Amino acid sequence: MDYQEGGIYMKKSLTAVLAFGASFGVLAACGSETNSGSEETVITVGTEATYPPFTYKDKGELTGYDIDVLNEAAERAGYTLEFEAMDFKGLVPALDAERIDLIANQMSITPERQEKYSFSDPYAISGAQVIVGSDNEDIQGIDDLEGKVVGSTQGSVYAQMAEEAGAEVKFYKGANQVLQDLQVGRLDAALNDRLFILTELEKTGYDVKAVGDVFNQSQAGFMARQDSDVLEGLNEALAEMKEDGTMEEIGEKYFGEDISQ
């Protein structure tokens, strides 16, 4: 998961919040006093906002599966969210620099990341799949990528998968650019999340197709620094949402199925 992890491109209006996200970065995840005298936990969240149906803008408003899940979980936990949109490659550096406190962008939970970061409990389960031009019959799956040029975004788990398959990886800013170059033959293939492929390829109209089996099942979680104290509240809310059917409802909205388990 993650296309931008990781890609290309509905609850609360966050347009104004995005505009002020950067200025509130230094206040993130710290307590501020409300008018009632209670302490408010404000979390600055980094997201790509160009990876539908997970995180994207619809008529200027931030929306998507990840955003809906986090909004609901934060409301139940009593947290206030401030969103900051940025390129995928800037998400982890922003977390390291404490500009943001949390990443909501289909971040795959991997052993390598867990060595340095903390994750919420998984809220999405998926896998990877290969994408090629619609007239490409040579590539039928991950095993055919050796020596091929594969498009991805920097820092993506899909870039790592392509490299491990022996491909030459060409990096792009986002999935739009990857698919554009793929359909005109500048790339041999791309890798992405099977849920992204399931929901977006038909909508976008790119002259590409998915090939081969889904592989490398992965789980996505909200990613934070190891010293984060907000994940416990989010995990309690996520468990409630799975139990009362809210997660299933959000999954049905975007994918026609529950992708949380």
Where do the language-model regions lie?
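C-terminal motif of bacterial Sec signal peptides marking the signal peptidase cleavage site
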Residues: 25-29
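A ligand-binding cleft/hinge motif common to bilobed small-molecule-binding domains
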Residues: 107-115, 161, 188-216
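Short helix-initiation/N-cap motifs at beta->coil->alpha
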Residues: 83-95, 137, 155, 170-184, ...
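Extended ligand-binding regions for polar small-molecule ligands
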Residues: 31, 67-76, 154-156, 221-261
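Acidic, polar ligand-binding/catalytic clefts
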Residues: 80-144, 208-209
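Extracytoplasmic small-molecule ligand-binding "clamshell" domains
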Residues: 39-106
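Bilobed "Venus flytrap"/periplasmic-binding protein-like clamshell domains
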Residues: 62-72, 129-179, 194-198
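Periplasmic-binding protein-like
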Residues: 49, 125-132, 198, 202-239, ...
